Each structure stands twice: as C-alpha cells, then as structure tokens.
Amino acid sequence: MTKSLVQQQFGAHAGAYATSAVHAKGASLGRLVELVKPGPHWQALDIATGAGHTAAAFAPHVARVIASDVTDEMLAEARKLAAAKGLANMETASADAEALPFEDGRFDLVTCRIAPHHFPDIPMFVGQVWRVLKPGGTFALVDNIAPDTESTPGFSSTELRDAAVTYNAFETIRDPSHSRCLGMAEWSEIITDTGFDLAHKERLGKDMEFQPWAERLGADTATIGRLRAMLSDGTPALQAFLRPRLVDGNLWFTLDEAILIARKPQ
C-alpha cells in the first residue's frame, strides 16, 4: 500500500466521505469533544481530516484548528464545510501524517479520527504527534480496531490473531488503501511507548449496513459478493467481533472503534 494509492482512492470518493453519516455524525465525534474538553485558547491540529468533520467539531471550542490531509480533494471538501458552517478559525494544510510540516511543540491538541488504519507506519505517526504537541498537550485518537483479547474475550490468542488477519483482509478487499487496523492493546502499547500518559480509553460499537458500506468506495458486484461471503461465513472469533445479522432483510454488522485520550507530560 502506497500513499499515492490513498490519495487516488480518497480523491475519487471525497464527496462520498463528505456526506457519510459515519464520518459526519458518528457517536465517536461528539464523544471525542466531550472527553477532550478543549480550551478556548488552544491551537489544534486534525490529522487526515478527510472532509473536515472532526476539525469542524472542535473549531467552535478552540482558538484555531488546522485540518490537514494528504489528499487535495479532501481538503477542498474540508474548506467547503468550514465555509458552510462559518468557521473562520478553521484552515487547511497539506500534510503527511508521518512527516508533519509543523514545528515542534506547536499545538495544544492533535486529533485523528477514523484514519490511522491507512497509515503504513503507526509508530512514526504517533512520534510525529508527540513532536508537534506542546508539553501538557492532548492527543485524541479514534480508529477502527481489530479483534484482540480486550474487544473479543473468550478466544485463544491464535484464534484472535487469525480473526484479525482475516478482518484486515476484509477491509483491504473493499478498500485497497487500507493498511492495518490495530487492536486496542497494541494501540495502548504504542502510545505509552512513545512517552504519552494514557488518560482514557474506551470502545464504541458502530453499526454498519453492509451494502452502503461496501459501495462507498465503488466496489463492483463480484467484490461485494466476496465481502458478503467473508462476513457471513467467518470463523467464530470473527463472527463474535463483527456480529453480522439481518435487519429487515438487510445485512448489518458492527465495527468497533477505539477512543484513546493521551497527554504529553509537562
């Protein structure tokens, strides 16, 4: 997976993400603002902003927020959102999550929501967050997670490892720019190994209707059929994690999101 593939994939489907209810109004968005308790003087950065929904949610509560992304089409959507909401303190910047073009210790808050599963090098990304945060600054992360003992108890480590591999394959078939979802425990380890104090973590279930989810990135009929079979015929551990079921004749499943709030020591 290359960053150019991420740009190609999301550039082609920027409009779909601008209107996606999961990204624009998902439960994790309001919860993130609630947990962070942003200050009115704060300088904030949203990494991999996509259509700008997270930056826009924080903008009314901070002095300034930069919505950054590696994809120009997404930044255009973020600018449209800021204009529509009258957010004069929200601006955009082209930025690679693993090589941020900002000086050390610039921000009071760095956010990143439903994006790190596209990043090739998660420790590099977290290290960049550490670098650009002020001492005492807050790192607020949301991302889809893979099954592990914290999210899916009652299975062996081998069963969970296999389920995580299959789940990531499931995501990659639908979206070739997908890199890897981590488990909750792995996220916690990387964040604390970087030097952060982990202040809070929780999981949120995100109910997804299969067909719109599969179609959002333009999957063809054969790919959708393959994904449907993987979801319906998965191992017990994968089924316990994704919880596929029929609702009014339509296939639904549940993705788990991790919310992690960490602080850079003073």
Segment roles from a protein language model:
Residues 171-186:
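Acceptor-substrate binding/catalytic loop of class I
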